[in-house]
């Protein structure tokens, strides 16, 4: 079936919103099961067929994105991804303070902006009633019916002044474009509504001639419409296939963009842990296509898409109400999913420093050459104006740089490491690299993983690269790579709930990365062999990447025989052949010793190679 037809009929939403309201159900359990059997991405638990109520059914399914919505809840759901929000008042965004109502910003179309109220003003009274200290009751004084008026007393620079303002309906768009720092095009997007792609395009066209870099702020953006995210991406990258969806049957669909790019400039993309779903699809696609420098913390990790059944496509079941269910996993332009793992920023920095670092790497075309520092990382040249960048911002940048980063002064010839550049500039910072890796042939891979928070040492900076790895430990390593939430559901008799690795083992088992020994036990304290680890890693690669998953189905008998001839057990041959074909083994296939204990440094190197090959860690 044509993808556009599917999406038109069912409305695929990429949202991280969950409605937790008490609902009167009109849909029957039998009808819900029919819809789940038809479209649900995962296999339904056997217990689902014993459910007597919808509430019980959805609890058994255990998917926060699969649920029933009453008519009121459905309307609220649809409103949550609209391109605009309407509020009634004088057109200000505010903060309550002990000194009055602080005007954080004035809104376009509001009477406050037209009358000359400014950000930073304090509203101390409304119609003569004091707003000091400010609270909800103070706010109630300035809102009211459209067309009515209110006189606000404003304190500015020690002087008071009165403004008589009309209360109006003010429309707040979910996407706004402006120019900051005199040369950066800034797009702030809180969600992807139906026309957000058009808003991106219009904003870029409006100011592109006067900027040399774009900054797209997706912090707190929980998602929206898939096609809108693709259209927004297309405004930067132009035509092509930018997103893939795969259903439970393995059928693949795609989203394409068919216009030229509206800008030649690269975008710096701000993200945080609340950046989810469609916004992750945007960020991941920009990363894969070489047009997005992602800055911030690792994103939420919602790489699944939902469809909505309502009266438009199932009139026999619904009358104003609806049911949303997970139907697809989505993959970025390069074939990687962000489901669970999230999008890993090129520059992983704290939320507190993310915006400052993002603006810093946008450079400054007016700076003197002597004040510029260049960072080469992940295929990008990041230009930093040292004269405008605070020392703590530089420290946050240096902490985020992996071993592959190269730095130099714009008018200099010497290429430096982050440590050397920081020393030259007199900036102190806390490196994330591990102290005992210098003699390891895999030092760069280990320290890259450490930079991105994927491996940890012992808390004192040591990794012990030459030591072996236990089965419980590898679950923690893979769990951190995937950004898994630990699970309390006990899967093995010998993994007690109180063990430090228990949550990781349970989570890895639920995802199918690890299996027990067939006797109900996992043997978490046993040393892991090379073939055991590579089997686990091959499952991870298949989960993360379309390319690895398809390659696994294409492995020939000749490849399996070659692995067996090297000493791999039959259950390990496919995994070894897959990783060998993907060129992600820590050593040539013929040099491996399948039954030997794998070393921590070897495990880290192959993990880095997989994350790099699938595009999640492109450094």
Predicted features, each with a name:
Residues 410-619:
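N-terminal propeptides
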Residues 15-19, 23:
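Hydrophobic core
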Residues 122-153, 201, 228, 302-313, ...:
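PDZ domains, with a preference for the canonical peptide-binding region formed by the helix
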Residues 101-102, 124, 137-177, 326-327:
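PDZ-domain C-terminal substructure recognizer with occasional recognition of PDZ-binding tails
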Residues 179-215, 219-430:
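C-terminal "post-core" interaction segments
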Residues 27, 83-133, 194:
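PDZ/PDZ-like domain segments forming the peptide/carboxylate-binding groove
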Residues 32, 53, 92, 112, ...:
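Terminal peptide-recognition signature
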Residues 27-82, 151, 156-158:
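Interdomain regulatory linker/hinge segments that flank or connect interaction modules
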């Amino acid at each position: 079936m044509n993808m556009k037809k599917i999406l038109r009929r069912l409305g695929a939403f990429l949202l991280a919103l969950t409605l937790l309201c008490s609902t009167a159900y009109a849909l029957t359990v039998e009808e819900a099961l029919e819809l789940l059997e038809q479209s649900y991405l995962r296999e339904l638990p056997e217990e689902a067929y014993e459910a007597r109520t919808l509430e019980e059914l959805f609890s058994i399914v255990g998917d926060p994105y699969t649920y029933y919505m009453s008519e009121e809840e459905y309307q609220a759901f649809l409103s949550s991804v609209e391109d605009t929000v309407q509020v009634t008042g004088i057109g200000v965004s505010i903060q309550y303070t002990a000194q009055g109502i602080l005007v954080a910003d004035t809104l376009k179309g509001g009477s406050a902006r037209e009358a000359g109220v400014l950000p930073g003003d304090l509203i101390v009274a409304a119609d003569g009633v004091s707003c000091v200290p400010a609270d909800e009751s103070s706010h109630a004084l300035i809102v009211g019916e459209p067309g009515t008026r209110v006189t606000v007393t404003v304190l500015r620079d020690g002087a008071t002044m009165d403004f008589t303002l009309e209360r109006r309906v003010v429309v707040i768009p979910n996407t706004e474009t402006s120019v900051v720092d005199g040369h950066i095009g800034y797009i702030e997007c809180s969600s992807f509504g139906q026309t957000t792609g058009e808003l991106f395009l219009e904003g870029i066209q409006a100011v592109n001639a006067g900027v040399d870099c774009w900054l797209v702020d997706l912090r707190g953006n929980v998602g929206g419409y898939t096609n809108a995210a693709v259209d927004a991406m297309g405004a930067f990258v132009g035509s092509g296939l930018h997103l893939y969806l795969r259903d439970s049957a393995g059928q693949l669909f795609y989203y394409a963009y068919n216009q030229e790019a509206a800008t030649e400039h690269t975008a710096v993309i701000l993200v945080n842990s609340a950046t989810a779903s469609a916004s992750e699809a945007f960020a991941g696609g920009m990363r894969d296509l070489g047009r997005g420098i992602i800055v911030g913390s690792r994103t939420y990790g919602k790489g699944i898409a939902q469809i909505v059944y309502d009266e438009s496509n199932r009139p026999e079941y619904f009358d104003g109400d609806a049911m949303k269910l997970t139907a697809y996993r989505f993959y970025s332009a390069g074939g990687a999913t962000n489901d669970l793992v999230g999008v890993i920023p090129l520059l992983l920095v704290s939320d507190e420093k993310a915006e400052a670092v993002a603006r810093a790497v946008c450079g400054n075309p007016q700076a003197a050459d002597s004040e510029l520092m260049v960072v080469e990382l992940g295929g990008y040249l990041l230009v930093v104006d040292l004269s405008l960048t605070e020392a703590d911002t530089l420290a946050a940048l240096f902490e985020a740089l992996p071993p592959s980063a190269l730095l130099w002064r714009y008018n200099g010839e010497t290429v430096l490491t982050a440590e050397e550049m920081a020393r030259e500039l007199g900036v102190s910072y806390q490196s994330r690299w591990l102290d005992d890796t210098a003699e390891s042939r895999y030092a760069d891979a280990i320290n890259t993983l450490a930079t991105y928070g994927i491996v940890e040492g012992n808390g004192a900076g040591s990794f012990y690269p030459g030591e072996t790895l236990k089965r419980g430990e590898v679950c923690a390593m893979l769990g951190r790579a995937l950004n898994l939430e630990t699970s309390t559901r006990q899967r093995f008799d010998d993994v007690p709930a109180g063990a430090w690795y228990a949550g990781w083992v349970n989570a890895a088992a639920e995802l199918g990365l690890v299996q027990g020994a067939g006797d109900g036990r996992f043997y978490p304290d046993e040393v892991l062999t090379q073939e055991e680890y590579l089997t686990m890693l091959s499952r991870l690669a298949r989960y993360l990447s379309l390319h690895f998953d398809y390659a696994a189905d294409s492995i020939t008998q000749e490849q399996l025989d070659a692995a067996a001839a090297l000493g791999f057990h039959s259950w390990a041959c496919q995994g070894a052949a897959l990783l060998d074909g993907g060129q992600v083994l820590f050593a040539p296939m013929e040099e491996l010793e399948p039954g030997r204990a794998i070393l921590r440094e070897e495990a880290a190197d192959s993990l880095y190679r997989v994350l790099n090959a699938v595009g999640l860690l492109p450094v």
